Amino acid sequence: MARDPSTLRYAETHEWVDVQEEGGDKFATIGISAFAVEQLNDLVYMDLPEVGRTLEVGEEFGEVESVKAVSPLYSPVAGEVVAVHTDLPDNLDNLNDDAFDFGWILKVKLSADLPETLMDFAAYQKQCSEAG
């Protein structure tokens, strides 16, 4: 099932969040937005966290490197990493075509509600248009 960008929540730092409930627990799938991928251009490396790591909101969990810059990746949610997309670092070109489905980075079992600072799609688009 294709992920609809208009239904996701977004951090100011360009990570997207898709929350699903499974067996009474809430899980957040996290990736970086198509806007971020476009701005970084020519991705060459991505560092992923380990399964089992506990993340806090705003904590750096990895980085993505392009020919232009190295950018940290920040957790938009609090919880335990339960899965990482291990195929992603070897297929970064696919992020250009599919930042929202193939481009997921990690899945986190939430330990708290989503932060109120996460934006809906309209607010995120406004932020991106203002950033140019």
Swiss-Prot record:
Coiled-coil spans in chain: none
Modified residues (N6-lipoyllysine): K68
Stored PROSITE patterns: BIOTINYL_LIPOYL, LIPOYL
Segments forming domain Lipoyl-binding: 27-109
Superkingdom, natural source: Bacteria
Swiss-Prot/TrEMBL keywords: Lipoyl
Residues making up the signal peptide according to the UniProt record: none
Keyword Metal-binding (UniProt): no
Obligatory cofactor(s): (R)-lipoate
Cofactor binding note: Binds 1 lipoyl cofactor covalently.
Any one GO biological process: glycine decarboxylation via glycine cleavage system
GO cellular component, as recorded: cytosol; glycine cleavage complex
Complex formation: The glycine cleavage system is composed of four proteins: P, T, L and H.
Homology family: Belongs to the GcvH family.
PANTHER family: GLYCINE CLEAVAGE SYSTEM H PROTEIN, GLYCINE CLEAVAGE SYSTEM H PROTEIN-RELATED
General function of this protein: The glycine cleavage system catalyzes the degradation of glycine. The H protein shuttles the methylamine group of glycine from the P protein to the T protein.
Name under which the protein is recorded: Glycine cleavage system H protein
Natural source organism: Rhodopirellula baltica (strain DSM 10527 / NCIMB 13988 / SH1)
Source organism phylogeny: Bacteria, Pseudomonadati, Planctomycetota, Planctomycetia, Pirellulales
